[in-house]
Design a protein with these regions (language model features):
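Conserved class I S-adenosyl-L-methionine
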Residues: 1-39, 146-147
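Core SAM-dependent methyltransferase catalytic element
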Residues: 187-204
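Short, glycine-/aromatic-enriched active-site segment of Class I SAM-dependent methyltransferases
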Residues: 143-162
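A short glycine-rich, Lys/Arg-flanked "PGG" loop and its adjoining helix->strand segment in the class I
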Residues: 121-134
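Conserved beta-strand signature within the Rossmann-like core of class I S-adenosyl-L-methionine
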Residues: 135-143
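Class I SAM-dependent methyltransferase SAM/SAH-binding core
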Residues: 47-49, 53-98
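A conserved beta-strand element that flanks and buttresses the S-adenosyl-L-methionine
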Residues: 109
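Short alpha-helix
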Residues: 163-178
Length: 204
């Protein structure tokens, strides 16, 4: 199988409807991350990095505390789908490594995105410097990581050309090296064969 770039694979998923399953498969982890992130917030602005069809953007926008909910994704097809479903919130088709929001954000969330970059630390640094307000939070969830052995076959199974495999410690160090404080990691949805979603978060 010829491997494709992540953005091309996800565009295919948007066309064939595979994006719908992402909400079902990731709901438990996303709910956990959002609940943790907003419990001490009053009103907040929210950005979903790698938003796909916008399901998390829509979900968070319905919360009373949320004053703005934004989605960004590199896949034109995913953004077209998000905009067709949701006329209320803003969506941008952009390269995450270069894009900057007009106004900095209180909470940046991402589920199953960062390991599709050759150098995830570069993206984490860009978000820290250009997206986040002071004392605001980045929280990410990933299923493809070293300790989750069952995930190691995914690059071949999915035919994706860029998937960067790192340990929990390495991901935590990325946040530390960039300058985040109050860094925490935990896992959601562990079973005997599945190590769960690895959550990493920190405060700017």
């Amino acid at each position: 199988m010829k491997r494709k770039l992540p953005v091309d694979v996800f565009s295919d998923w948007a066309i064939n409807g595979k994006d719908v399953g992402m909400e079902k498969n990731h709901k438990l982890s996303v709910d956990n991350m959002i609940e943790f992130s907003i419990k001490k917030l009053d009103y907040f602005t929210f950005l979903d990095a790698g938003c796909g069809n916008g399901w998390v953007v829509r979900k968070v926008s319905k919360l009373n505390k949320c004053i703005k909910s934004i989605g960004i994704d590199g896949s034109q097809k995913m953004i077209e789908k998000a905009k067709s479903i949701d006329k209320k919130n803003k969506y941008y088709c952009e390269d995450l490594l270069n894009w900057k929001p007009k106004n900095k954000i209180d909470l940046v969330h991402s589920m199953e995105v960062f390991y599709y970059f050759k150098n995830p630390k570069k993206l984490i640094k860009h978000i820290y410097s250009s997206w986040l307000k002071k004392n605001s939070r980045l929280i990410i969830g990933i299923d493809y990581y070293y300790e989750n052995k069952i995930s190691h076959s995914w690059p071949n199974e999915c035919g994706i050309s860029i998937m960067s495999l790192f340990s929990e410690k390495k991901w935590k160090n990325f946040f530390f090296d960039v300058g985040f404080k109050e860094i925490k990691t935990w896992k959601v949805g562990e079973t005997k064969k599945w190590s769960g979603t690895l959550v990493i978060t920190g405060i700017k």
